[in-house]
Amino acid sequence: RDPNLGKVMLYQLSYFRIWRTGAKINSFPVSAKLGAAAFFLAVILGVSAGVIAALKQNTKWDYTVMGLAMTGVVIPSFVVAPLLVMIFAIILHWLPGGGWNGGALKFMILPMVALSLAYIASIARITRGSMIEVLHSNFIRTARAKGLPMRRIILRHALKPALLPVLSYMGPAFVGIITGSMVIETIYGLPGIGQLFVNGALNRDYSLVLSLTILVGALTILFNAIVDVLYAVIDPKIRY
């Protein structure tokens, strides 16, 4: 039996006691800021790339976007992160190769890109497939027959149903970004929850590891619940 499990409901885990004293309170904002930035970057760039590929189906734009997306999916973040450091920090000297410095933008760019790249690729592929399916539906043909501008058709009629599969993917993407941040924060030396988790595991601080696992699990459940609510709001077919 693990005595720490019984203390969860009593708010007595060692990490939470440290959290209440403020000793480790700075770790969570670092991970939250990086994760939120990577998540929104993945959604914005992924949806944009997917829509462009769908509208330019079977053209060089489509092949280029899907080729880059396939590359982004198969290359893991722990390979992308050192490559970005080598290119942009060591060779070109454009960006710092690590550190946080209060969350300055130039210190966030490389870890944010490394963390979001695979999800940009996945969202682009999902958006493309969904958008192509929507563009061949009857109500889009009707809108075209009425002479509506293509821009209005995309923004007013096609985009919303095409984003439903993307919305379903946001839950797993959020979980992946949380777990992936552990690797990224360690590589870039960021003082976030991920690095705290790795240090706790290496130092055999099981109370800390258990506490962080519970925290990540709670955030995952919360975000999946939010996604389910948003899905019901956007898609009236599944409302009860």
Residue ranges of each PLM-predicted region?
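Short clusters of hydrophobic/aromatic residues that line enzyme substrate/ligand-binding pockets
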Residues: 5, 94-95
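Short, small-residue-biased leader/transition segments that mark boundaries at the very start
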Residues: 11-14
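Phosphate/pyrophosphate-binding betaalpha-module
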Residues: 84
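A hydrophobic, multi-pass inner-membrane permease signature
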Residues: 72-80
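Alpha-helical transmembrane segments of integral membrane proteins
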Residues: 28-61, 77, 90, 100-240
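Membrane-interface segments at loop-to-transmembrane junctions
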Residues: 64-68
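N-terminal, intrinsically disordered charge-dense segments
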Residues: 1, 19-26
